[in-house]
Amino acid sequence: MRATFHLFTFIFLLLFSSVICISTPGFRNDHESIGDDEEKTSSTILVSTIDGRLRALDSETGEIKWTLQEEPVLRSPSAVKQGFTFLPNPLDGSLYVLKNSSLKKLPFNIPQLVHASPCKGNDGILYAGSKKDVWFGIDPKTGLKVETLSSASADRICPANQKQTIFLGRTEYRVSMFDEKNRGKTWNATFNDYSAHLLPEVNTWPFKHYASSSHGYILTFDRETGEMRWEQDLKQPVVALYLLRDDGLHKLPFEVMGKETMENVAKNIFTVDQWPTVLGVNAADPQTTSLTNQFFPALFVGESSFGLYAIEALVDHQTITYSPKLLGPPLLEGPAPIALTEMEKEEYLPPRRPIIRNIPPSITHKTSDGEYLLLGYHDRPMMTMATIIPTRYPVPGPHKAIGSTIERPPPQLLGPVEPQKHEDTSFILLLLNNHPIPFYATLVTMFALLLTVIWQCGRQWDQQKSTSRMDSFEIVNNPGESRSAQTSKQSNRGSFGWANRKIEIPEGWMAVGSKLMYSPSDILGTGCEGTVVYRGTFDGREVAVKRVVSEFVKFAHREADLLRESDTHPHVIRYFCMESDSQFRYLALELCIASLNDYVEQKEVQQNVTIALRDIMKQATDGLAHLHASKIVHRDMKPQNVLITMASQRGEMRAVISDFGLCKRVQPGKNSISRGIASGLAGTDGWIAPEVLISASTSYPVDIFSLGCIFYYVLTSGTHPFGKSLHRQANIVNGEYTLNKLADLDDWSLADDLISSMLNVEPLHRLTADAVLNHPFFWTSEKRLAYFSDVSDRVEKEEDNSPVVRRIETDARIVVCGGWREKICDALKEDLRKFRTYKSFSVRDLLRAMRNKKHHYRELPEDVRQSLGDIPDQFLHYFTSRFPRLLLHVYKATEYCSGEAVFKRYYSDDVRARMYPIVEEEERVRKKIKEEMANEVWARAPKPVEQRTPLKLDKRNIKKKSNPNTD
């Protein structure tokens, strides 16, 4: 009954206030008077730029409707004077003074100086100012100026239409400054401001605007969805935004950002999922932004056609700013800074940004007496202690007779400006004056609603209090119902029931679902967007519980689906289940002891990990190869996402790939992922491949690039191939990296070749995951020795001019260090002379010697065996330590034979596919040359002598001739 009574009471008050609001004549007339014209007007915003133009833009599309040219907002000198240069801010008229090449902010602005003038500063500066007000009416549809009203005269250009004409008020402030000691030093400025500050600022505006500091580039976002609505380039710095309504201008808030920062935002806005949150849109509280965490305040000093100016703007960590500490002469060393740990520095100190140490002459204003000004971004200056004393005072009441004493208030110093906080009050007073009855009706409704909320909270408190008296509790959920987290509130232990099954919950733990529990106090790690990883249990097994905010439930489900498909591989983190409550999603994952980043940075972790470093690298590559074979691109490979599991019952540890939150599947029939709004710019700064930033699509090579950075990071104990974090991503885009620290490794040539191939700027030229696994860097000693023997057998009987022999003997003297006989020990040298002759500069003969000594190892003299060491490790190291380029050289040369059955286990399919057309072409050329040579030999061979048949003689004729006397 009580609940029904309160409900009916609340509904009655709500209906009563609504009827009063609707029946109010003023309220109804105001709303009826709002026709199509006002709706069109309210959707128009006016953008004021420094050159004096007022542009009307459509608030939905950003399309320019019309332009009105007025006087420039700011006119100031463009020259720099010693000790007498002021930089005005065109946004609010605040002033900055340049002294000794250092900027300081004055505690007053131009309008305040004009109101207080004539006045004198404590630094000897004399101030004089004037003010001029003017009203002008415009047609909101065309922007045509209809009428001008001022104290001097009233000009009417065309007949004014009271229904359509909107009057805008503008105030012109002129201020002059004089040095009382030096009359040659003067400074003048004119500042124009519109009268929008007299009306309440629109706080419920559905859009959020950002403007650049040095040109008129504007970005507009939807506050609720975070979607970018439109962009516009006005070519001149923006100084103010107004909402155009029938009652005048309403000032709109906007953020000023650096030009380079705006370009980065515009370039990445469709690819970075985190930009809406970074920019402060699509948040629970629109006024609460994370700009201070991502951007930093700075002062931009610029130059326009109307003089020098300064605007406070937000910049990112890549923007170079000038520090006043480095622009002046060297100073005495100050006190030592407070000693802070690295963790305290990250928590309390802002991140460093680059500082210009040399003055670029192209952006410097200099004077003959040594004063100079740098155009660009400066560290936000400190405020000076300057004050001004007014020289005249308002006289209260009527004037007294001549000779009487006028009581004047004591002089007051005009110091730092305190922000006026009367906007809310003026807005409430405006509602009360224009619509009193709806105002009071709204108050009554809010009061009734407050009583209802208090009553409902009290009722829930009573129910919770009665529930807390229970000794234990059970939850029985049917399949398909939503699961919620529960925890026991008993002193020692509670019980948790699921389908009448009781599970004990340790004190301080939380239970989600039937089998999953976690400890909120035992945090294993944190991620972006509120993701936290806790230690927990799943069905009695220790697991890591990853908690994801419900707003990102789509990503949590996608991660769970990808894990279900890929966690059968031993080097992909195992997935157990996913539970949910009203606020979060919980993923139960395999518990690991450390990440690869912990392994590199913490020595105690290295002592507890039993797996070799090279095995960690190979297993991580194996897991990545499995993902790529499953058509999955990880997109966030970094040392923190390569984990080392707990030791198994056999004491074995494994390296696994984790964090599938940014993974994407390559669709069937495609080879890449398009970079759209849904896909976004994925990855972690410093580990992102260059094509992610500059290409329209990405694919598997992005993971290979990140893995190459990880390899170098691990092999060099924490060094990144692209340098320090500040310039790392820029170096990645430019392809500037160094691998000089690999020279300390025994296999430096193999490591250098592997990582260089993985960091290639061209994605198509990078190795695949299978090719990385087949690289000789990961071969065991047995496999390397067997490879040398197989190559030696292959080229033993080959002719010297055969393709494979020519490849092996190319640059042979570099490979064998001039002559390999000079690098081996005397015992082995003498043993080689006993059997056959070897060429000291031939790689093929070196391989033959290694093969023969390996096959006849037991027959070698004792001193030779001691020099060579045991097979395979010491024997192999004997030769590779003397000839470090040998294995890589032979591996590259013998790619020609990768398609042969003997070498298929040494090369990946990618190498065979790459070499197949080369081998085919070379074989075709060889065959053609042989045919031409055969034809040439046949053509040059001597012709055989013709054999003539002997003549048969007639014996009868011979007889006749021999015996002529016969007859």
Curated annotation (Swiss-Prot):
Q: How is its activity regulated?
A: The kinase domain is activated by trans-autophosphorylation. Kinase activity is required for activation of the endoribonuclease domain.
Q: Where is the composition biased (Basic residues)?
A: 957-967
User: Phosphoserine: which positions carry it?
Assistant: 672
The UniProt keyword set, sorted, is: ATP-binding, Endoplasmic reticulum, Glycoprotein, Hydrolase, Kinase, Membrane, Multifunctional enzyme, Nucleotide-binding, Phosphoprotein, Serine/threonine-protein kinase, Signal, Stress response, Transferase, Transmembrane, Transmembrane helix, Unfolded protein response
**One Gene Ontology CC term in the entry:** neuronal cell body
The family database entries (CDD domains) matched by this protein are listed as: Luminal_IRE1, RNase_Ire1
Q: Where in the cell is it found?
A: Endoplasmic reticulum membrane
Q: Which processes are annotated in GO (biological process)?
A: determination of adult lifespan; endoplasmic reticulum unfolded protein response; intrinsic apoptotic signaling pathway by p53 class mediator; intrinsic apoptotic signaling pathway in response to endoplasmic reticulum stress; IRE1-mediated unfolded protein response; mRNA processing; negative regulation of multicellular organismal process; nematode larval development
Observed phenotype of the null mutant: In combination with RNAi-mediated knockdown of atf-6, causes sluggish movement, arrested development at the L2 larval stage, and lethality soon thereafter; larvae have intestinal degeneration and develop many vacuoles in the intestinal cells. In combination with RNAi-mediated knockdown of pek-1, larvae have intestinal degeneration and develop many vacuoles in the intestinal cells. RNAi-mediated knockdown restores fertility, reduces the accumulation of unspliced tra-2 in the cytoplasm and suppresses germ line masculinization caused by RNAi-mediated knockdown of rnp-4/RBM8A.
Its UniProt entry gives the catalysed reaction(s) as:
L-seryl-[protein] + ATP = O-phospho-L-seryl-[protein] + ADP + H(+); L-threonyl-[protein] + ATP = O-phospho-L-threonyl-[protein] + ADP + H(+)
Record EC number:
2.7.11.1, 3.1.26.-
The annotated topology with respect to the bilayer is: Single-pass type I membrane protein
- A matching Pfam family: Ribonuc_2-5A
Q: Which domain of life is it from?
A: Eukaryota
Q: Taking every annotated instance into account, which residue ranges of this chain make up the domain KEN?
A: 781-909
PTM comment: the record says: Autophosphorylated mainly on serine residues.
Check the UniProt entry and state the signal peptide residues, or none: 1-21
Kindly report every residue range on the membrane side named Cytoplasmic.
456-967
Give residues annotated as binding ATP: 524-532, 546
Gene Ontology terms for molecular function: ATP binding; protein serine kinase activity; protein serine/threonine kinase activity; RNA endonuclease activity; unfolded protein binding
Q: Which family does it belong to?
A: Belongs to the protein kinase superfamily. Ser/Thr protein kinase family.
According to UniProt, the name of this protein is Serine/threonine-protein kinase/endoribonuclease ire-1
Lineage of producing organism:
Eukaryota, Metazoa, Ecdysozoa, Nematoda, Chromadorea
